[in-house]
Amino acid sequence: MDPQGIVKAFPKRKKSHADLSSKALAKIPKREVGEARGWLSSLRAHIMPAGIGRARAELFEKQIIHHGGQVCSAQAPGVTHIVVDEDMDYERALRLLRLPQLPPGAQLVKSTWLSLCLQEGRLTDTEGFSLPMPKRSLDEPQPSKSGQDASAPGTQRDLPRTTLSLSPPHTRAVSPPPTAEKPSRTQAQLSSEDETSDGEGPQVSSADLQALITGHYPTPPEEDGGPDPAPEALDKWVCAQPSSQKATNYNLHITEKLEVLAKAYSVQGDKWRALGYAKAINALKSFHKPVSSYQEACSIPGIGKRMAEKVMEILESGHLRKLDHISDSVPVLELFSNIWGAGTKTAQMWYHQGFRNLEDLQSLGSLTAQQAIGLKHYDDFLDRMPREEAAEIEQTVRISAQAFNPGLLCVACGSYRRGKMTCGDVDVLITHPDGRSHRGIFSCLLDSLRQQGFLTDDLVSQEENGQQQKYLGVCRLPGPGKRHRRLDIIVVPYCEFACALLYFTGSAHFNRSMRALAKTKGMSLSEHALSAAVVRNSQGVKVGPGQVLPTPTEKDVFKHLGLPYREPAERDW
């Protein structure tokens, strides 16, 4: 999305029901701990942050304690209420809590119930706020007296949504689709990795990953089958498909509005909603024709009932009302989060400190050295450079490196190697085929580039990553009108060159798909190596390193994974 697009998307924000709880909270008089009221003394609650957000969850916890209640874990004896986001579903809540069923006497309630209690100053009835149980679970004993009523059609009350939120007010949105509607999601327990990890992360299943990228959940493997996916199953993986075969987006008029919301939740740090929207967006982009009905939307893997309602609202009215209720903070948070070195948490901190524009931040804000550089070159960093400029930057680094040793290999990776016409930054990978001569080149090269005036600012002078050395900085080509550009220089041993080349070429989606596929084969893929016979625990976390496989070229990585080789231009997912 255009960095300025979200600012244009939210010129004004209408009052929403979510504002009511903020006003209600403002009316609650501050008291000393010893003076805390006891009207929540019978409440022993656990607040689940997923969807609610950590900052808002902590605010809930403070108010519970302030009014005499107790905060505990979901597994604690005597827990009475487990408070979840109002768009959470029953099975997903249990899965995130890692509970086979609710503890005896506990109720699973929506956060709007707690907001209403705090607004009215009393414990209100949970009817209409309890999460409905899946039909197959109704024969199991459940402590919530309203569970069956809530699951019956038409019995939930349509109450005003009230939320207890920090400034900026937390906006309501659709969560990732309920797993009860997609049985195949529960079959895959293998997890994909975060882009910056070593390839081991238990948060997102490979099934979720494929739906996120292609809109299609994988076919569950046969119970007696081997670990290797069948050829037809491989076709479902992004890494097995050329990006040139991306499906035509027949639902652009829907996805462009959902993308605005996804971006809004992302800059607010609400990763669960952002992920839910991302999965739905990619599912819609991959659908083979324009969506025309609610039933058709519900039939698409990755689209839940609530998301289908949003799709129909856009189809029927050409608009999505949620866009009118996004917090005023969103364009400011995006403005701040575009500063290099500032993530969503830092952007939120600056917003809460009262900053609303870059000028105020520059004159009054407390910035790290890296953030100050990012702010100084704010416009240059956001401006994508033409491919020809990226080639000049690579050539400058290569000439300087080969002046020390002509045998050094220097390759520009990222979007440049994938053949894109514009690039956000330049990543130059350096190695030597003899496996030794790359040593010592790192510092000499940086000194040379600084003396030439090519490097203007250092963001991270040296980042050690195993045997790899990485420099993150700013460069500028000589000549009038040249802009400052982001440049990363990575020196790697030749034994890791192929995996590093694959990793730094990307795209990020393609890499995640490769690593998730490796996991299904009992392997582990990172920027350092491809390993086989990797030992993992029941949660999918790697507990044994396995055996490093020989990968002299990228083609060997694909071959070990049973994939056809994809040229860099075919990896642009």
UniProtKB/Swiss-Prot annotation:
Quaternary assembly: Interacts with PCNA. Interacts with PAXX; promoting POLL recruitment to double-strand breaks (DSBs) and stimulation of the end-filling activity of POLL. Interacts with XRCC4; promoting POLL recruitment to double-strand breaks (DSBs) and stimulation of the end-filling activity of POLL. Interacts with NHEJ1/XLF; promoting POLL recruitment to double-strand breaks (DSBs) and stimulation of the end-filling activity of POLL.
Pfam families: DNA_pol_B_palm, DNA_pol_B_thumb, DNA_pol_lambd_f, HHH_8
Cofactor needs: Mn(2+)
Organism: Mus musculus (Mouse)
Residues bound to Mn(2+): D425, D427, D488
Annotated stretches, region: DNA-binding: 263-277, 343-346, 464-503
One GO BP: double-strand break repair via homologous recombination
Residue span of region Involved in primer binding: 418-427
Annotated localization: Nucleus
Stored CDD domains: BRCT_polymerase_lambda (cd17715), NT_POLXc (cd00141)
Gene3D superfamilies listed in its UniProt record: 5' to 3' exonuclease, C-terminal subdomain, Beta Polymerase, domain 2, BRCT domain, DNA polymerase beta, N-terminal domain-like, DNA polymerase, thumb domain
Annotated binding of dCTP, by residue: R384, S415, Y416, R417, R418, G424, D425, V426, D427, N511
Catalytically driven reaction(s): DNA(n) + a 2'-deoxyribonucleoside 5'-triphosphate = DNA(n+1) + diphosphate
Segments of this protein annotated with the region Disordered: 126-204, 214-233
Domain BRCT stretches: 35-131
A GO cellular component annotation in the UniProt record: site of double-strand break
GO molecular function: 5'-deoxyribose-5-phosphate lyase activity; DNA binding; DNA-directed DNA polymerase activity; metal ion binding
Protein name per the record: DNA polymerase lambda
